[in-house]
């Protein structure tokens, strides 16, 4: 009890101690270069704009000391975003301070364990802080129904989407909240400008992305990598006869080249089944080998004979995008089965999928009762968790690198529910005294 009272009175001091501990652990670890890091440092064509610009700005200012500067700046961005996120939640959701201290520690875990995002030159280093800020402002708009908070959310979301496009699901979720707020407060006309901005945001992001590549790489096009990731799961479940769905000789030749290599290396679903392996584990283990190690190099080799390196990458992206949709349609049941398994893998198992769906429906069912911020928060954070994994599962393997952004959500919901039970129990005891 004394500890809880101390935390309650000295919350800022306790958070400061957590921040100092995390900072020490980050500073004593060197910054690491991952296989993807060079693409951001050298501003590769297949990288979205924000993080390469961030890295190269730091490189231009700090020169040989850029790694240390990156580590410090990435840590500071993280600490600032966590602090803002926690302080805003404390203002609008009444929980015991102890729960918020625990939540702060959980939000800081990606900086000291497993991902160590401040110590890596990867998009996660700034995507995570941007994600927390975007989430916080959407929650504030949901709580307070002030369009100022929505404006801030859209600004951070714009930057976030130019860092990692997997967060596009915030747009439909934002539209639903905006319609709900407008209906509830009868402010449809007043909210039309924000509605227009939300609808146009994906197009503005696409235009900005293309403009960036025109300025930096000389090509007015979106970051060319989408088609490769869309085609990879479709190729995993394909069979040799699927070449017949294509009418273009170019697409037929590309399909045959990809399929032959995948089959020879046992990267496809048929190999997993014949070897008695778990399909989703086999897919997760081989996704990068299919996408980055097979589809891309085969296309690169084919098209670089006649095109420049950048033009060849654009051609690969266009061709793989065109090939993906017909192949998915032709094998839709198998593709859908793989998608569902990949989606469930992102939650670790299907029971957690069911749990998150139940929690989401619970939150939605309670948003019209008194003290709704708790239930709005439950509905929103479970919805973004489900949406994130749902969109990642379409064209990626659902590794923690792409799903860790919401690892805190289940803890947060449990803290809300435990606090509610505790508060109800204490109130009930007082009435019997």
Q: Which residues does each PLM region occupy?
A:
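Transmembrane-helix signature of polytopic, membrane-embedded enzymes
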Residues: 85-110, 128-129, 148-152, 379
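Membrane-proximal stem/loop segments at transmembrane-domain junctions that anchor or position
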Residues: 222-330
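Multi-pass, polyprenyl lipid-linked donor-dependent membrane glycosyltransferases
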Residues: 73, 113-138, 160-170, 402-407
């Amino acid at each position: 009890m004394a500890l809880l009272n101390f935390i309650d009175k000295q919350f800022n001091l306790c958070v400061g101690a957590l921040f100092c501990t995390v900072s020490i652990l980050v500073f004593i670890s060197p910054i690491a270069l991952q296989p993807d890091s060079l693409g951001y440092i050298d501003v590769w064509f297949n990288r979205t704009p924000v993080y390469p610009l961030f890295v190269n700005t730091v490189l231009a200012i700090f020169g040989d000391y850029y790694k240390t500067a990156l580590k410090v700046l990435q840590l500071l961005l993280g600490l600032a975003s966590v602090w803002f996120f926690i302080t805003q939640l404390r203002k609008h959701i009444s929980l015991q301070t102890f729960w918020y201290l625990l939540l702060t520690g959980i939000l800081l875990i990606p900086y000291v364990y497993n991902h160590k995002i401040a110590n890596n030159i990867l998009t996660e280093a700034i995507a995570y802080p941007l994600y927390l800020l975007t989430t916080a402002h959407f929650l504030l708009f949901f709580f307070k129904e002030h369009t100022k908070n929505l404006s801030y959310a859209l600004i951070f979301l714009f930057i976030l989407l130019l860092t990692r496009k997997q967060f596009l699901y915030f747009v439909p979720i934002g539209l639903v909240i905006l319609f709900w707020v407008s209906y509830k407060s009868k402010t449809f006309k007043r909210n039309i400008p924000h509605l227009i901005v939300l609808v146009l945001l994906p197009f503005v992001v696409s235009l900005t992305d293309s403009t960036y590549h025109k300025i930096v790489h000389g090509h007015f096009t979106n970051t060319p990598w989408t088609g490769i990731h869309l085609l990879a799961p479709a190729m995993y479940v394909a069979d040799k006869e699927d070449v017949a769905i294509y009418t273009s000789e170019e697409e037929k030749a590309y399909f045959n080249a990809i399929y032959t290599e995948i089959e020879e290396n046992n990267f496809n679903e048929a190999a997993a089944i014949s070897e008695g392996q778990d399909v989703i584990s086999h897919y997760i283990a081989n996704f990068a080998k299919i996408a980055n190690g097979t589809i891309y190099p085969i296309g690169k080799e084919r098209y670089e004979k006649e095109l420049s390196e950048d033009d060849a990458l654009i051609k690969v992206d266009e061709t793989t995008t065109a090939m993906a949709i017909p192949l998915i349609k032709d094998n839709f049941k198998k593709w859908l089965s793989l998608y569902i398994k990949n989606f469930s893998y992102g939650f670790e198992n299907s029971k957690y999928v069911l749990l998150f769906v139940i929690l989401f429906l619970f939150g939605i069912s309670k948003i019209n009762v008194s003290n709704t911020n708790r239930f709005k928060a439950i509905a929103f954070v479970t919805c973004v968790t489900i949406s994130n994994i749902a969109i990642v599962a379409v064209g990626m393997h659902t590794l923690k690198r792409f799903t860790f952004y919401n690892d805190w959500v289940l803890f947060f919901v449990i803290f809300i529910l435990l606090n509610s039970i505790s508060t109800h129990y204490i109130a009930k005891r007082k009435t019997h005294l």
